[in-house]
């Protein structure tokens, strides 16, 4: 049993990989003061509720864009499972056939995982890989594995949080799929509608502009990330794979282990 850990700015996603299949997934809010003992206690309870013996773990692969919790995650696996977790970084890109052709020669490990998994799903294709997380990231990758362009914008969670922080009288809302009717006569539902449809329109609009700029290419578009599943039934522009990042982390982990064993 392998633990695949995706540490984002908002949530830590723990996924178990058992007998060749992705099993349970659990989400814990990302918080920089979480200790190893606290993380272990939460995992143990979640695993117990699912009738899983978490101590059957034999390895751990971690992608993290929130460095403040890396120490606690490492300590948890070492202290409670006797496992040294494998952390994925953009330094592994060349090993995986990815060339980072950006002004900054580094990207988040989650983006690398997304790209690796997308290239496996769609080999020999020019790709537009979108991660709809805390920040929405549009990655442009050609069939040779060159990451040559990007667009970054606020994610849905950022937009919801900005309403709370920047207004005094508006209600706090959770964005779920509204009705197909966009217009509402109630404040809360109209705010939910604006956030939901406004965010989706932004994503679809950016995609259309990218496709126009890259008109000479036949881009395969694939999306993942925490917010992506909310839009599965309301857009035909996106091919959504909610496990894309998790699949990529697993692929990179296997490559790193294989490379280490081959030395």
Swiss-Prot record:
Biological process annotations from GO: coenzyme A biosynthetic process
Entry note: cofactor: A monovalent cation. Ammonium or potassium.
Pathway(s) annotated for this protein in UniProt: Cofactor biosynthesis; coenzyme A biosynthesis; CoA from (R)-pantothenate: step 1/5
Active site (record annotation): 110 (proton acceptor)
Subcellular location as annotated: Cytoplasm
A Gene Ontology molecular function term of the record: ATP binding
Annotated residues for binding of substrate: 108-111, 187
Cofactor: NH4(+); K(+)
Keyword annotations from UniProtKB, A to Z: ATP-binding, Coenzyme A biosynthesis, Cytoplasm, Kinase, Metal-binding, Nucleotide-binding, Potassium, Transferase
Summary of the function given for this chain in its UniProt record: Catalyzes the phosphorylation of pantothenate (Pan), the first step in CoA biosynthesis.
Family: Belongs to the type III pantothenate kinase family.
Name assigned to this protein: Type III pantothenate kinase
Species, as recorded: Anaplasma phagocytophilum (strain HZ)
């Amino acid at each position: 049993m392998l633990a695949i850990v995706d540490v984002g700015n908002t949530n830590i996603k723990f996924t178990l990989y058992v007998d060749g299949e992705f099993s349970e997934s659990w989400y814990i809010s990302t918080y920089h003061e979480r200790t190893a003992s606290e993380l272990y206690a939460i995992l143990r309870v979640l695993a117990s509720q699912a009738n899983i013996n978490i101590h059957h773990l034999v390895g751990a692969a971690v992608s993290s864009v929130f460095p403040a919790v890396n120490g606690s995650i490492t300590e948890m696996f070492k202290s409670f499972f006797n496992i040294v977790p494998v952390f994925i970084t953009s330094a592994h890109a060349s090993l995986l056939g990815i060339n980072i052709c950006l002004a900054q020669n580094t990207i988040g490990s989650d983006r690398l995982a997304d790209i690796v998994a997308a290239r496996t799903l769609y080999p020999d294709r020019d790709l537009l890989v979108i991660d709809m997380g805390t920040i929405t990231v549009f990655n442009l990758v050609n069939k040779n594995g060159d990451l040559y362009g990007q667009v970054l914008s606020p994610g849905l969670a950022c937009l919801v949080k900005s309403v709370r922080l920047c207004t005094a009288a508006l209600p706090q809302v959770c964005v779920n799929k509204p009705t197909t009717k966009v217009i509402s006569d109630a404040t809360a539902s109209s705010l939910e509608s604006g956030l939901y449809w406004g965010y989706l329109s932004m994503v679809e609009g950016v995609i259309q502009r990218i496709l126009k700029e890259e008109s000479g290419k036949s881009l395969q578009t694939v999306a993942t990330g925490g917010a992506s599943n909310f839009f599965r039934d309301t857009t035909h522009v996106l091919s959504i794979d909610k496990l894309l990042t998790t699949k990529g982390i697993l692929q990179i982990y296997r490559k790193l282990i294989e490379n280490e064993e081959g030395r």
